[in-house]
């Protein structure tokens, strides 16, 4: 696993990016061309740079919260043999389920997606229960969370620890959800 620090003007706020699947630069250029052909447009330069530097990755600070929206990033998509991590496969799977100008770029807890506008580079939160245009009655536009990916990553904070009340509820219900992907990511971060 490779680790890089995301460029930030304040060193103490630096967000470390854990690269889960590195990809050689010559293969990366080919895959970016394939992605741009698939989506029918040239990617915003800041997102193309992010993909080139990180491919499939997870930021150490991965929690987003503002007045109305809160979520945790599982990992950013990239180019992968694993269909669940591959940005092209995910784009194809969700085509028609979100606005045409958006594409998923990161897995979010609960089956949601962080998306980017293919033309403007603005970043949106796609909440599957309200924004899945493939379901009858759902046609709400996803929530704008940042003007660009760099600003979004700078807004991320460490995932908060559960409150005592949340721990009590989990113990009382006897249910703790651990997905295979979360185990894989935790193991990769320990390596």
Language model features: what each stretch is:
Residues 2-113, 163-169, 178-191:
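A surface-exposed partner-binding patch
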Residues 117-120:
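Short acidic-glycine loop/turn motifs at beta-strand connectors
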Residues 125-126:
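Short hydrophobic/aromatic-rich beta-strand segments that constitute the beta-sheet cores
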Residues 129-158:
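Compact, glycine/acidic-enriched structural inserts
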Residues 149-177:
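Mixed-charge (acidic/basic) macromolecular-recognition segments
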């Amino acid at each position: 696993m490779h680790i890089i620090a995301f460029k930030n003007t304040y060193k103490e706020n630096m967000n470390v990016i854990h690269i889960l699947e590195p990809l050689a630069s010559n293969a990366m250029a080919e895959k970016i061309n394939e992605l741009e052909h698939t989506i029918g447009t040239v990617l915003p330069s800041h997102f193309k740079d992010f993909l080139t530097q990180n491919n499939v990755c997870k930021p150490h600070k991965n929690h987003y919260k503002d007045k109305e929206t809160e979520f945790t990033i599982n990992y950013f998509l990239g180019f992968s043999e694993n269909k669940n991590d591959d940005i092209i496969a995910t784009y194809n799977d969700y085509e028609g389920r979100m606005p045409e100008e958006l594409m998923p770029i990161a897995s979010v807890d609960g089956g949601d997606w962080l998306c980017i506008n293919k033309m403007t580079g603005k970043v949106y939160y796609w909440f599957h229960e309200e924004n899945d245009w493939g379901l009858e009655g759902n046609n709400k536009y996803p929530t704008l969370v940042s003007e660009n990916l760099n600003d979004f990553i700078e807004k991320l904070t460490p995932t908060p620890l559960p409150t005592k009340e949340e721990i009590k509820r989990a113990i009382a219900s006897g249910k703790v959800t651990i997905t295979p992907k979360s185990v894989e990511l935790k193991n990769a971060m320990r390596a």
